[in-house]
Design a protein with these regions (language model features):
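Generic structural signal for hydrophobic
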Residues: 2, 32-33, 101
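A cross-domain feature marking catalytic cores of carbohydrate-active enzymes
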Residues: 9-12, 42-44, 80-83, 113
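C-terminal active-site subregion of NodB/CE4 polysaccharide deacetylases
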Residues: 52-167
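Alpha-helical scaffold elements lining the catalytic groove of polysaccharide deacetylases
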Residues: 15-39, 45-73, 90-93
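Single conserved hydrophobic/aromatic residue that forms the stacking wall/gate
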Residues: 1-11
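Residue-level detector of short, conserved catalytic/binding motifs and their immediate flanks
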Residues: 8, 38, 77
Length: 167
């Protein structure tokens, strides 16, 4: 049995580790969250940059998500792209990657977009830009959030600064 170093380390440190038992516990948490109104989305299995990977890599990654996560969350038709990427520019979705994801059951596509408003509603999909609200954004670009709240009033002065820049 060959496995990634990280998973192998878990087995070494916890010889009674049971993936089935962990999945059972995760499903209970997901079910409780859904009962409270939470919705779940894919962020891809391996935090993939869908704008840069090939179709075959996207297919393999999506299948891993569907095999390992969908059974826990009951499936999802929402995908939130990592790395601020998208399937294309502002034009309508098209191409092999879109057709594959659409065929895999996704209807809602979200990218990370710092603009104040971006929604594209089409017959086959709903596309929305979203803004990340995190310490990095609040520290380096508070002006991008000023229409939502006053960053100075919520940024904890005890928080260690400066926030490390991303590479």
């Amino acid at each position: 049995l060959r496995m990634s170093r990280g998973l192998g380390d878990v087995y070494k440190r916890q010889p009674d580790f049971s993936l089935a038992k962990e999945r059972e516990g995760a499903k209970k948490v997901a079910d409780a969250m859904k009962a409270e109104g939470w919705l779940f989305a894919s962020h891809t299995w391996g935090h993939q940059n869908v704008g840069q990977i090939g179709l075959e890599t996207l297919q393999t990654d999506t299948q891993k998500f569907k095999d390992n996560v969908d059974p826990l969350i009951g499936g999802t038709d929402i995908i939130i792209f990592a790395f601020g990427t998208d399937l294309c520019g502002p034009e309508d979705y098209h191409g092999d990657k879109f057709e594959y994801l659409k065929g895999a059951g996704y209807n809602y596509f979200c990218n990370v977009d710092s603009s104040k408003y971006y929604v594209q509603i089409r017959e086959r999909y709903f596309r929305q830009g979203r803004r990340n609200l995190d310490g990095y954004r609040m520290y380096y670009h508070p002006e991008l959030l000023e229409d939502l709240f006053d960053v100075k009033s919520v940024f904890d002065p005890v928080r260690p600064t400066p926030v490390p820049p991303m590479a």
